[in-house]
């Protein structure tokens, strides 16, 4: 059995999958996830039908509905992921089972990745279970399958990054409650804080300089690329962001999703590396 097979097929991962999916509460959670997303989408659809042309929903309103559903799903993912991942290692420590886990033949890399995969697999099931809801969008047109794939790509990468941060905090912080708080604080800084900084300080810079140059452009870009909702809108409505980032003497600007993908992959790799190194702080890592 090669190293890659051992990494993804191991007793730790099998045990976590059984614990995660054998409970009725897990499926009840997915039901309420879809209920909230579907109910909000139907409500927004009703609003669009009232303000649409002659009370009907066309392709333009359908696109607005798709953006609303994508942003709603990012919001649900952002607030559910810390709760699922921030107690993966600290919970074992509090139950006094971590030392037993560390005496097994599983490497630090295998343990960390198994905990992450098992936690995020639950959210992946919830995300893909929402696909039938998007039939409402395809019913009226205005959205291509590429847009759906791009939206799901942003959601999955957001989930992976926040989940990696949760596992990292769970490894370096002994108490689960503090780990959860730290993960939520970091998530809020990425999802909300970055956009607030641009709104507050960006307007100040523009107020002092009526002809902003590349400095202001990159200031806005570097902070907005960390914000998943903003990146989603930039992917689905590129013309809006082309106008926003256009500066005299510059092109429309580097696509926001490029910075998002690179930065979030970097955060994910760094978080997992720290977690792997800190899992066995007093001994040489075996993974």
Mark where each language-model region is:
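Aromatic- and glycine-rich beta-strand/loop motifs that create alpha-glucan
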Residues: 1-31, 280-284
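Helix-loop-helix units of permease transmembrane domains in multi-pass membrane transporters
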Residues: 13, 88-121
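Hydrophobic alpha-helical transmembrane segments of multi-pass membrane transport/permease proteins
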Residues: 25-49, 74-78, 183-193, 269
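Alpha-helical transmembrane segments of multipass membrane proteins
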Residues: 36-40, 122, 126, 130, ...
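Terminal transmembrane helical anchor/hairpin motif
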Residues: 47-52, 56, 188, 192-270, ...
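Secretory targeting signals
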Residues: 66-70, 75, 118-174, 182
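Long, hydrophobic alpha-helical segments
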Residues: 67-91
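Hydrophobic/aromatic residues in alpha-helical transmembrane segments
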Residues: 81-85, 133, 165, 271, ...
């Amino acid at each position: 059995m090669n190293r890659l097979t051992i990494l993804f097929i191991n007793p730790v991962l099998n045990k976590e999958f059984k614990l995660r999916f054998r409970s009725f509460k897990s499926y009840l959670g997915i039901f309420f996830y879809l209920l909230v997303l579907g109910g909000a989408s139907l409500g927004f659809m009703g609003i669009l039908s009232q303000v649409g042309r002659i009370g009907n929903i066309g392709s333009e309103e359908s696109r607005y509905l798709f953006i609303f559903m994508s942003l709603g799903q990012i919001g649900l993912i952002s607030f559910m992921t810390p709760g699922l991942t921030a107690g993966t290692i600290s919970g074992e420590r509090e139950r006094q089972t971590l030392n037993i886990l560390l005496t097994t033949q599983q490497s630090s890399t295998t343990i960390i990745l198994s905990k992450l995969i098992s936690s995020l697999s639950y959210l992946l099931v919830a995300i893909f279970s929402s696909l039938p809801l998007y039939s409402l969008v395809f019913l009226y047109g205005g959205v291509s399958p590429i847009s759906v794939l791009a939206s799901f790509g942003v959601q999955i990468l957001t989930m992976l990054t926040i989940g990696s941060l949760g596992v990292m905090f769970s490894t370096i912080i002994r108490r689960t409650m503090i780990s959860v708080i730290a993960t939520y604080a970091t998530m809020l800084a990425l999802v909300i804080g970055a956009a607030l900084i641009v709104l507050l300080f960006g307007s100040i810079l523009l107020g002092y300089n009526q002809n902003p140059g590349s400095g202001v452009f990159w200031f806005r870009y570097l902070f907005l690329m960390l914000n998943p909702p903003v990146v989603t809108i930039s992917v689905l409505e590129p013309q809006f962001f082309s106008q926003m980032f256009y500066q005299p003497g510059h092109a429309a600007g580097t696509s926001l999703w490029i910075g998002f993908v690179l930065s979030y992959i970097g955060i994910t790799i760094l978080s997992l590396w720290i977690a792997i190194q800190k899992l066995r702080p007093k001994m040489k890592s075996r993974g």
